C-alpha cells in the first residue's frame, strides 16, 4: 500500500480525540558500530475524549510488537498502527526496528572516512520521527519526551533536555535524559558518537559545541566565534521576545552527512560543512551567524510556540529567517546582514515568486507531503522580507510589544496565523486584516516604476499594490560618485501614489531605496541605461544592492541581456566596500557568465569577471574571495597566476584543479598528490569534484554513478560535484545524462525532504538541453512526490529563462 501521508482532516480528528500526556522512548544504538540497526521502544501515554473510539499511531519503522493497554495490536502496511477501542486513559507500547540508516528518513549513520568512527543523527521535520519510533507525528500534539539511550561506551549521547544520568553497562552506557518541556515530535533529537566537545558559560547558559574527532582542530578554531554569537543571540531574543530561553543547556552539534541545520529544542544539529576546512571568508562567517541565529529563533518560533498545522509553516520559518537577520544586525558584528540577504536569498525569492510554483506565504496544506514542498524561497527569504516590511509598517517598538504579548499568551502551546496577527494588530494599533490578505494569502510580487507628471513624481504599481511602506531615493552625481539628495518614504495602497519632497531634478531616482519592502522595480524608460551605468556609484551596500536586484530581475524577465547585467555587476564589484555582498555578487556574476550568457558572449564576460577578481585580489582582506572567483573563470594563462597566488592553500589548489580539469588539462597525478596531503576527512569529495569536471566520457560516467545512482556523495556536497559535472561547452558528453535525469525522477524523493530537494534541483541539467526538454521534464514530474514536483518545476523554470537569455545577442 505504501507509506501514507497524514492529511489535515486526519490530524484535526486525531487532535480532537487524543491528548498526549508523555512519551517515554528507549533507544538502543549498540548495533550501529558494526551494523545499520536502531531498536526503539516507544511508550505513549495519552487520553481519549471519546472512550471507545479508534484512531491510529504513526510508525513507518518495522514493528516488532505493539500493545495498547496490554492488548496486542496488528500494524498496517501503510506506516500506521490502528488503535481500536480507546480507553479514557491509554498506554501504547511499540517495539520497532529501523534497519536502514543509510537512505531511510529520520535517522542516519555516518562513517568518518578519516578514522572509521561512527556517528548517528536524527532529524524529524516534517514527519520523519515515525520512521524511527511510534508517535503521533503531527505538530499540535505536543508532550514531554523522556529519552533513554543505550550506546557504545566510547560514545557521547545528546538530546534536547541535557544533563542525563549515565550508567555504565560493560561495553555500553545508558543515558537517561530528563523530561523535555511539551514539544512537537519533530522538535526532538538524539545525536550520538565519539564527539570532540567544547563547553563555555554565557549569560547564565551552559553552551556546548560538538563535532567528529577528525574535525577537532577546526571546531577549536571556530569555537570562540560560535560561543560569542550564541551568547549575543540568546541575549537579543530574550529581550526582543520578553522571554529568556528557559533551559540552561544549549548544545550545537556539527554532524557528517547532514543537510543544512535543524532547530531541535536545546540541541541544534548542523551539517559539519559549516566547519569550513579552509579559513572562512567573511560571507561564510556571516552565513554561520545567520544560520545559528535562525535555528536559535526557532526555540521561540516553532518550539516554545508551535504552528498548529503546516499551513502556518511560515510562523516558524519566515519568522526565524527574519529574526536571524534582525538579531545579526542588532547584536553582532554583521551589521550589513540585510544587504547580504538582498544579494542572496531575496534575489532567489523574486525569481521563485514569478515562476510556476509561486504560492501564498500562507496557504491551505492538504497533507504533510504537500507541506514538504513549501520549504522554499517563498516561505524563507520572501517571508523574511515581508516580515521586515511588516515591522516597518507597524514600527519596531510596537512590533516588539506584539511579539512579547504573543509569546506570553501562547507559550508551550500551538497557534494559527490569526493569533499572531491579533497580537501585532493590538500592539500596532493598526487593522492588519487587509495587510494579512494581501501579503500572506496572495501570491506574486508587486512591481513599481516612476512617472513624472509635470513637477510631480508618481509611483506607479503594476496593478493594485499590497499595503506597504517603501522609499524613493534621489541621487545626484558628485565627481565619480552619487550622493543621496533626498529619501522619501511613502505608504502605498493605490496603483498611483504621488511622491512629494523629491528634488525637482536628479541624476537617478531609486525605487525601494533602503530595501524596505518585497517588490520588484523598473527604472523609468529614460533612466534605464543610466541605472545600468551608474549602479556602482551609489553610496551604500543597500542602495547598490537594490540597483543590482532591479538589473537581475530584468535579466530573468528577458528585459536585459547577460552582457548588460554582467557589465553592471562587475562594475559594482570593482567599487564595492561591503564584505557582506562581495562574495554573493561575485557568485551571481560568475553564474551569469556561465549559465545565462550566449556562447558568443561568454568568453568576454568570463574574462571581465576574471579581471575584477584580479583587481580585488590586490586587497589583502579580499584576496581569498577574489582568488576563489578567479578559480571559476581563469583561462589557462590565468591559472598559472592563480597557482602562484595559491601557495600552500589547499582549498585554492583544489579549486584551480577543477578549472584546469574543465579546460582539458591532465590533473590526475596532481589531484592524487593533493588528496594525500589534504587533512580534510572529506577531501575525497574534492577529488571527485575534479574528476567530475574532466571532459571525458569515462569521468562523466564514473561521477554520475557515484553522484546520482549510488548516492555516495554526502548530501551537503552534491551541489559542488554537480556544478563541476554540468559544464558549458561539454554538451555532447552531457546529453545522455539529461535523459538519465528524467529516468531518476521516480526515486528522487528517497531519503526524505532534504535529499529530495537537493538531488532534484542540483542534478537538473542546465546544458545539453532545449526548451522541449524542459517541457518534457515538467510533464514527467507531474505524478512525483510534491517536494520533487515543486522543486523540479522551479528549477526548470529558471533553466528555461537561462535558455532564453542564451538565445539573445548582446
Task: Explain the meaning of each model-derived region.
Residues 50-52, 87, 165-172, 203, ...:
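Short, glycine- and charge-enriched coil/turn segments that flank and shape catalytic ligand pockets
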Residues 67-68, 148-151, 213, 297, ...:
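Non-catalytic accessory/interaction domains
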Residues 97-100, 112-120, 125-127, 142, ...:
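Extended hydrophobic/aromatic-rich secondary-structure runs
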Residues 177, 209-464, 591-592, 607-608, ...:
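Hydrophobic alpha-helical and helix-loop surface patches within well-folded domains
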Residues 182, 274-275, 692:
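Hydrophobic pocket-lining residues within nucleotide cofactor-binding pockets
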Residues 1-248, 349-353, 375-381, 392-397, ...:
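Acidic/His-enriched low-complexity segments
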Residues 61, 338-339, 705-710:
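Charge-dense, low-complexity polyampholytic segments
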Residues 14-27, 144-145, 223, 327, ...:
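Charged, low-complexity, helix-prone segments enriched in Lys/Glu/Asp/Gln
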Amino acid at each position: 500500500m505504501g507509506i501514507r501521508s497524514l492529511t489535515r482532516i486526519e490530524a484535526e480528528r486525531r487532535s480532537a480525540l487524543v491528548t498526549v500526556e508523555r512519551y517515554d522512548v528507549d533507544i538502543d544504538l549498540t548495533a550501529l558500530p558494526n551494523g545499520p540497526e536502531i531498536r526503539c521502544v516507544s511508550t505513549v501515554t495519552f487520553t481519549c475524549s471519546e472512550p471507545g473510539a479508534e484512531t491510529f499511531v504513526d510508525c513507518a519503522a518495522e514493528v516488532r510488537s505493539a500493545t495498547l493497554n496490554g492488548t496486542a495490536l496488528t500494524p498496517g502496511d501503510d506506516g500506521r498502527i490502528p488503535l481500536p477501542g480507546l480507553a479514557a486513559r491509554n498506554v501504547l507500547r511499540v517495539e520497532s526496528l529501523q534497519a536502514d540508516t543509510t537512505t531511510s528518513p529520520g535517522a542516519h549513520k555516518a562513517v568518518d572516512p578519516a578514522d572509521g568512527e561512527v556517528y548517528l543523527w536524527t532529524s524529524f521535520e516534517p514527519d520523519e520521527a515515525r520512521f524511527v519510533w511510534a508517535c503521533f507525528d503531527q505538530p499540535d500534539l505536543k508532550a514531554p519526551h523522556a529519552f533513554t539511550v543505550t550506546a557504545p561506551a566510547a560514545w557521547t549521547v545528546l538530546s534536547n533536555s541535557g544533563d542525563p544520568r549515565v550508567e555504565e553497562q560493560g561495553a555500553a552506557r545508558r543515558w537517561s535524559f530528563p523530561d523535555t518541556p511539551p514539544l512537537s515530535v519533530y522538535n526532538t533529537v538524539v545525536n550520538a558518537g565519539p564527539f570532540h566537545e567544547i563547553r563555555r558559560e554565557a549569560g547564565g547558559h551552559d553552551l556546548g559545541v560538538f563535532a567528529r574527532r577528525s574535525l577537532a582542530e577546526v571546531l577549536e578554531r571556530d569555537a570562540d566565534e560560535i560561543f560569542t554569537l550564541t551568547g549575543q543571540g540568546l541575549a537579543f531574543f530574550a529581550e526582543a521576545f520578553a522571554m529568556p530561553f528557559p533551559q540552561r543547556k544549549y548544545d550545537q552539534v556539527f554532524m557528517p552527512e547532514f543537510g543544512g541545520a535543524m532547530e531541535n529544542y536545546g540541541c541544534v544539529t548542523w551539517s559539519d560543512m559549516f566547519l569550513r576546512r579552509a579559513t572562512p571568508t567573511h560571507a561564510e562567517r556571516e552565513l554561520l551567524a545567520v544560520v545559528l541565529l535562525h535555528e536559535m529563533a526557532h526555540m521561540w518560533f516553532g518550539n516554545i510556540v508551535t504552528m498548529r498545522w503546516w499551513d502556518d509553516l511560515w510562523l516558524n520559518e519566515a519568522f526565524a529567517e527574519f529574526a536571524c537577520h534582525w538579531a545579526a544586525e542588532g547584536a553582532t558584528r554583521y551589521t550589513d546582514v540585510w544587504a547580504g540577504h538582498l544579494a542572496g536569498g531575496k534575489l532567489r525569492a523574486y525569481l521563485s515568486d514569478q515562476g510556476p510554483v509561486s504560492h501564498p506565504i500562507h496557504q491551505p496544506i492538504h497533507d504533510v507531503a504537500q507541506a514538504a514542498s513549501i520549504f522554499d524561497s517563498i516561505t524563507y527569504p520572501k517571508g523574511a522580507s515581508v516580515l521586515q516590511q511588516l515591522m516597518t509598517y507597524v514600527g519596531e517598538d510596537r512590533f516588539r510589544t506584539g511579539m512579547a504579548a504573543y509569546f506570553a499568551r501562547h507559550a508551550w502551546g500551538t497557534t494559527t496565523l490569526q493569533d499572531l496577527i491579533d497580537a501585532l494588530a493590538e500592539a500596532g494599533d493598526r487593522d492588519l486584516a487587509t495587510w494579512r490578505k494581501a501579503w500572506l494569502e496572495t501570491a506574486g510580487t508587486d512591481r513599481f516604476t516612476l512617472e513624472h507628471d509635470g513637477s510631480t513624481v508618481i509611483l506607479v504599481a503594476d496593478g493594485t499594490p499590497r499595503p506597504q511602506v517603501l522609499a524613493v531615493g534621489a541621487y545626484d552625481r558628485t565627481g565619480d560618485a552619487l550622493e543621496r539628495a533626498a529619501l522619501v518614504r511613502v505608504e502605498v495602497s493605490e496603483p498611483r501614489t504621488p511622491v512629494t519632497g523629491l528634488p525637482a531634478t536628479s541624476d537617478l531616482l531609486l525605487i525601494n531605496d533602503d530595501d524596505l519592502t518585497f517588490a520588484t522595480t523598473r527604472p523609468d524608460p529614460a533612466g534605464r541605461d543610466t541605472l545600468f551605468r551608474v549602479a556602482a556609484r551609489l553610496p551604500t551596500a543597500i542602495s547598490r544592492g537594490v540597483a543590482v536586484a532591479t538589473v537581475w530581475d530584468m535579466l530573468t524577465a528577458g528585459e536585459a541581456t547577460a552582457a548588460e547585467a554582467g557589465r553592471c555587476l562587475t562594475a559594482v564589484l570593482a567599487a564595492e566596500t561591503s564584505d557582506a555582498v562581495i562574495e554573493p555578487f561575485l557568485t551571481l556574476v560568475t553564474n551569469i557568465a556561465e549559465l545565462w550568457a550566449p556562447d558568443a558572449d561568454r568568453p568576454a564576460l568570463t574574462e571581465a569577471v576574471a579581471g575584477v577578481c584580479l583587481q580585488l585580489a590586490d586587497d589583502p582582506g579580499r584576496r581569498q574571495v577574489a582568488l576563489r572567483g578567479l578559480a571559476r573563470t581563469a583561462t589557462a594563462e590565468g591559472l598559472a597566476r592563480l597557482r602562484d597566488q595559491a601557495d600552500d592553500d589547499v582549498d585554492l589548489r583544489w579549486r584551480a584543479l577543477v578549472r584546469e580539469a574543465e579546460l582539458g588539462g591532465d590533473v590526475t597525478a596532481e589531484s592524487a598528490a593533493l588528496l594525500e596531503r589534504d587533512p580534510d576527512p572529506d577531501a575525497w569529495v574534492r577529488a571527485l569534484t575534479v574528476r567530475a569536471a574532466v571532459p571525458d566520457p569515462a569521468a562523466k560516467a564514473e561521477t554520475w554513478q557515484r553522484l546520482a545512482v549510488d548516492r555516495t556523495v554526502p548530501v551537503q556536497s552534491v551541489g559542488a560535484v554537480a556544478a563541476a559535472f554540468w559544464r558549458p561547452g561539454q554538451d555532447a558528453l552531457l546529453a545522455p545524462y539529461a535523459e538519465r535525469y528524467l529516468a531518476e525522477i521516480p526515486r528522487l524523493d528517497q531519503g526524505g525532504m532534504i535529499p529530495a530537494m537537493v538531488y532534484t534541483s542540483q542534478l537538473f541539467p542546465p546544458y545539453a538541453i532545449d526548451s522541449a526538454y524542459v517541457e518534457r521534464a515538467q510533464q514527467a514530474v507531474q505524478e512525483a512526490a510534491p517536494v520533487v514536483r515543486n522543486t523540479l518545476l522551479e528549477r526548470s523554470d529558471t533553466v528555461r529563462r537561462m535558455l532564453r537569455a542564451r538565445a539573445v545577442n548582446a
